[in-house]
Amino acid sequence: MQSPYPMTQVSNVDDGSLLKESKSKSKVAAKSEAPRPHACPICHRAFHRLEHQTRHMRIHTGEKPHACDFPGCVKRFSRSDELTRHRRIHTNSHPRGKRGRKKKVVGSPINSASSSATSIPDLNTANFSPPLPQQHLSPLIPIAIAPKENSSRSSTRKGRKTKFEIGESGGNDPYMVSSPKTMAKIPVSVKPPPSLALNNMNYQTSSASTALSSLSNSHSGSRLKLNALSSLQMMTPIASSAPRTVFIDGPEQKQLQQQQNSLSPRYSNTVILPRPRSLTDFQGLNNANPNNNGSLRAQTQSSVQLKRPSSVLSLNDLLVGQRNTNESDSDFTTGGEDEEDGLKDPSNSSIDNLEQDYLQEQSRKKSKTSTPTTMLSRSTSGTNLHTLGYVMNQNHLHFSSSSPDFQKELNNRLLNVQQQQQEQHTLLQSQNTSNQSQNQNQNQMMASSSSLSTTPLLLSPRVNMINTAISTQQTPISQSDSQVQELETLPPIRSLPLPFPHMD
């Protein structure tokens, strides 16, 4: 067969293309070889034309002389071609950003029957497990999956979307959906009775797993339905297997527990805890007759006698804590009332409180005038125990109940400190006496040796000076010991760790 194009024409076309390519290459070579007189003073880049250099200089200077004249647009450009390209955004009817997107085409409405036939044929043809007995299906509500209808916009997407409708139809059975297009029924437990909750849970999980396995065998169009079913299964409430804590002492709770144990003895997961003891005797109240109310009250009062709480500001609790704990233990064992703890009859408490308030006011008024001014100074560090006891008695008259205990404790501590200081003082005295005796022995030895060697008239003055120095050294030691004894009779009060009561 002859070719439709003659050979001469093909050769002419090839020659023309070769000529054009050679010409373009020659032009490029000529441009590259041509001199570039216009050079950038900043980056030293050379250009063939001056306008190219000026356009390049705007990169370094940041000048943008070309502004967009569209109302509301404030963009500026350094090159004119960039401005013309920008103007197309305002003038173009089809925006550039939406060129790659697919346009929405509203097609002809598709029949709902065809869409349902194409979308959910797998649920009708799927092999489900055999039907359950009625006693197992009674606490369960089936969910029908029907296609979404009556929507003009999403008519093309009916093959992919489904609607979950929970038993809403005009049928007689409230648990079943009377619709010609019911495709599958997936049981979902909605608070069944407690006796059948655990029995139904096993079947529910098995039925859901069989339904999901049958759906997984369908084609790829039912993938969306599988996702919806899995999310629905996650939303279904399943009876929790965690043990419940229930206090069962009343008759109603006992009856409910017996019924539950009789119905499901294997799956009873309630943990019976002992009820906490109450402070009142409710058993005696329930069993008592209405005639002997007075005797019942007397019994409850005698059996439920509680200790009256003592005051927070009581001085016995602040100063002597151990005695209060011992007395509180004895109160609980014997059941009596101790007046030292501040537990008194409520009838006499008002009178006692008034008397205590009056005594406190009088003691405060007296303490302002009778307290010695030397209490505030440091000169009282050398006072004896009698003055210290007098000052403490004057300052703390309103603490009449706790003052003897406090004074005893203070006296004991001061006596202990004084005994320690006396022992130290005796040790110092014994050391001083031993030193003095040694010095005297040395002096006697020196005197005897000097008397043997020389006569008294020829005694050197140095020996006399040594003896006088030793005697003078012994006298100030004795004087200093007497001063130390006078100063160390009593220690300063502030140095003792005494728990003084806080003044209001």
Curated annotation (Swiss-Prot):
GO biological process: negative regulation of transcription by RNA polymerase II; positive regulation of filamentous growth of a population of unicellular organisms in response to starvation; positive regulation of transcription by RNA polymerase II
UniProt keyword list: Carbohydrate metabolism, DNA-binding, Metal-binding, Nucleus, Phosphoprotein, Repeat, Repressor, Transcription, Transcription regulation, Zinc, Zinc-finger
Biased composition (Polar residues): 1-14, 294-305, 322-333, 473-486
Modified residues (Phosphoserine): S278, S302, S310, S311, S314, S377
Compositional bias of kind Low complexity: 106-121, 134-143
ZnF segments: C2H2-type: 38-60, 66-90
Predominant place of localization: nucleus
Any one Gene Ontology cellular component term annotated for this protein: nucleus
InterPro entries xref list: creA/MIG_C2H2-ZnF, Znf_C2H2_sf, Znf_C2H2_type
Localization in the cell: Nucleus
Family: Belongs to the creA/MIG C2H2-type zinc-finger protein family.
Record's miscellaneous remark: Present with 830 molecules/cell in log phase SD medium.
Name this protein carries in UniProt: Regulatory protein MIG1
Annotated source species: Saccharomyces cerevisiae (strain ATCC 204508 / S288c)
